[in-house]
């Protein structure tokens, strides 16, 4: 493994019964790269992301993140944004920030607060009182406020307006360190 290679997928295949969701994927992602997974719904983007995060086991092939199979170590260096809301929507935004700061040692509370201010999201709001787009922005803020080596974003812009989409993409590009990599999936070709 080259020291610059952060993600290596070799012959990655995932079947669900007789249906093949992913067939023999070979992918290398170097440090500091921004890669987009583009494809229609059902093309294997989320399956690939779940395999990278160790949430699924491959039918065949292998995944290495920083030289390790998905597990405890890789979870500590990956900041993952799933395609569905996973947060407790009864919590206030500032409580979610505190929760992430307590849970992740690499969480940057100042960065999260600055991004909330930029998007004019009230930290005292309960998540469920925010629009769908603002809920997605909060999830992205929490994900991008970690000092991770790899940011894995599954359809982060699917439900937001075009102006917010631009902010999210620029945030994804500008708020990670120079050596961090970003893997973003989308089915929207304009992105």
What are these regions (language model features)?
Residues 60-74:
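Conserved ABC transporter NBD signature motif
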Residues 165-178:
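Helical segment within the ABC ATPase nucleotide-binding domain
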Residues 53:
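Helix-to-loop junction immediately C-terminal to a conserved catalytic motif
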Residues 83-139, 146:
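ABC-family P-loop ATPase nucleotide-binding domains
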Residues 151-155, 160:
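Catalytic Walker B motif of ABC-type/P-loop ATPase nucleotide-binding domains
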Residues 35-40:
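The feature captures the beta-strand-to-loop junction immediately N-terminal to the Walker
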Residues 43, 162-164:
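Helix N-cap at the start of a conserved alpha-helix in ABC-type nucleotide-binding domains
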Residues 7, 22-24:
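Conserved structural motif at the start of ABC-family nucleotide-binding domains
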């Amino acid at each position: 493994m080259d020291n610059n290679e952060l993600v290596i997928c070799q012959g990655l295949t995932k079947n669900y019964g007789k249906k093949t969701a992913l067939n023999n994927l070979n992918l290398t992602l170097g440090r500091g790269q921004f890669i987009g997974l583009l494809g229609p719904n059902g093309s294997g983007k989320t399956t690939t992301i779940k395999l990278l995060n160790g949430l699924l086991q491959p039918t065949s092939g292998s995944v290495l993140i920083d030289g390790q199979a998905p597990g405890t170590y890789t979870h500590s260096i990956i900041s993952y944004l799933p395609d569905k809301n996973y947060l407790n929507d009864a919590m206030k935004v500032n409580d979610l920030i505190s929760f992430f700061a307590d849970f992740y040692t690499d969480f940057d509370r100042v960065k999260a607060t600055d991004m909330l201010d930029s998007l004019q999201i009230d930290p005292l709001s309960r998540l469920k009182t925010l629009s769908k787009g603002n809920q997605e922005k909060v999830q992205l803020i929490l994900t991008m406020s970690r000092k991770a080596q790899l940011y894995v974003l599954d359809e982060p812009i699917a439900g937001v307006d075009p102006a917010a989409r631009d902010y999210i993409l620029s945030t994804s590009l500008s708020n990670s360190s120079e050596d961090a990599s970003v893997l973003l999936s989308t089915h929207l070709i304009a992105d």
